[in-house]
A protein has these predicted regions:
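A glycine-rich beta-to-alpha transition motif near the start of alpha/beta enzyme domains, typified by
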Residues: 1-115
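ATP-dependent small-molecule kinase catalytic core of the GHMP/sugar-kinase superfamily
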Residues: 90, 99-142
Length: 142
């Protein structure tokens, strides 16, 4: 059994797991694992899988789509990941950095007394030039 937590941000839901869990359980193929656990009929069901790794002693978020493909980033996912990090006392500060495939992201968080959690992430300027978009599937972009 793999320990995980499930979070939701603006209607997108994510399974979040620490990579240590996957290593301890002998799960080497994260793409296959993502497809299995994200399956809404036979798995837990989610839009994606977020895996916490550590790089240079900093939290690193790896994102997998529900079909098992890896993507460089997910906007709603990073906010849910920030909530997971705070809930699990991985960082103490309200402002912290998380590494993702495209680079480091600074996240500002706030926990309200009523329980609402807020995360603000500057993901940089949007890219509209299709020649500069990361295309991990190597498909032709129109």
């Amino acid at each position: 059994m793999v320990k995980f937590e499930k979070y939701q941000g603006l209607g997108n839901d994510f399974i979040i797991v620490n990579e240590k869990e996957l290593i301890e359980k002998g799960i080497p193929d994260y793409n296959e694992f993502a497809a299995l656990v994200c399956d809404r009929h036979f798995g837990v069901g989610a839009d994606g899988l977020l895996i916490l790794k550590y790089v240079a002693n900093m939290p690193f978020m790896f994102y997998y789509n529900s079909d098992g493909s890896q993507a460089p980033m997910c906007g709603n996912g990073i906010r849910c990941f920030a909530h997971y990090i705070k809930n699990n006392n991985i960082v103490e500060e309200d402002t912290f950095v998380v590494k993702v495939v495209p680079g480091d992201l600074t996240i500002e968080t706030h926990q309200e007394e009523e329980g609402d959690f807020w995360a603000k992430v500057n993901m940089g300027k949007p890219i509209f030039n299709v020649n500069k978009i990361i295309n991990s599937n190597k498909e032709e972009l129109i």
